[in-house]
A protein has these predicted regions:
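A structural motif corresponding to the C-terminal lobe/cap of the Radical SAM core domain
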Residues: 1-118
Length: 118
């Protein structure tokens, strides 16, 4: 998950480092003759949406552009890794995340907006 209020750039890069460590462990543990080709690791992140009645309910939500920048930090860190071809990275669409935040924090007045948009 990206976009937590306490998140640092090291936290974001840590996602890529964990994927790299998993790939390295595979090559260390599985004997070469037992491997079925190269390892393929799928890394997927979603973006934090503050929800009511949780410790982060009053935390601000990032803008769409900020979410994309955070995803690019992870993507660029994966590209700099030794096993970059073994790791695929995708992320949740930021516009859907913003909509989710609107629905999660909105009240009954949101229904008019939803009806008009639909």
């Amino acid at each position: 998950m990206l976009g937590l209020p306490t998140e640092t750039e090291d936290d974001m890069k840590g996602i890529a480092h964990l994927a790299q460590k998993i790939a390295e462990t595979y090559y260390e543990v599985v004997p070469k003759e037992q491997r079925r080709g190269k390892v393929q690791i799928n890394v997927s992140t979603s973006f934090f949406v503050p929800k009511p009645f949780t410790p982060f309910q009053w935390a601000p939500m990032f803008r769409e552009e900020d979410f994309i920048e955070k995803a690019k930090v992870v993507k660029n860190e994966i590209r700099s890794q030794l096993n970059q071809r073994s790791i695929r990275y995708n992320w949740h669409e930021p516009d859907v995340t913003v909509l989710e935040g609107f629905l999660a924090r909105g009240d009954r007045r949101c229904s008019k907006v939803i009806l008009k948009a639909y």
